[in-house]
UniProtKB/Swiss-Prot annotation:
Residues 94-122 are annotated as: Disordered. This is Small ribosomal subunit protein uS13. One of its GO terms (biological process) is translation. The keyword tRNA-binding applies. Pfam families: Ribosomal_S13 (PF00416). Belongs to the universal ribosomal protein uS13 family. Located at the top of the head of the 30S subunit, it contacts several helices of the 16S rRNA. In the 70S ribosome it contacts the 23S rRNA (bridge B1a) and protein L5 of the 50S subunit (bridge B1b), connecting the 2 subunits; these bridges are implicated in subunit movement. Contacts the tRNAs in the A and P-sites.
Amino acid sequence: MARIAGIDLPRNKRIEVALTYIYGIGRSSSQDILQKAGVDPNTRTDELTEAEAGQIRDIIDGQMQVEGDLRRVVTGNIKRLMDLGCYRGLRHRRGLPVRGQKTKTNARTRKGPRKTVAGKRK
């Protein structure tokens, strides 16, 4: 099992798909990495030679922010917005949608389960 960026890649998948198991690498990024390394995207992970795995490792370590570093940057950006007190920061702080979505009926993912309020007595 190839281990790249601290992640065990699945053996039986194509290397193009297996690289997407690393946080911060999607399909297009994995295709770019494989093209730079000169590795065929259809190669299975267990068929990789040690030299090819080393090339992929060097490209990812040298040119990309992945896993813990990327998570730290993202949380730092959100924290910065919250400290600034800008609109986006306030939305993050309140746990509401940040990008202008309506909240009257939807936004359950951000708001969590409904807090039922008792109806008015007549």
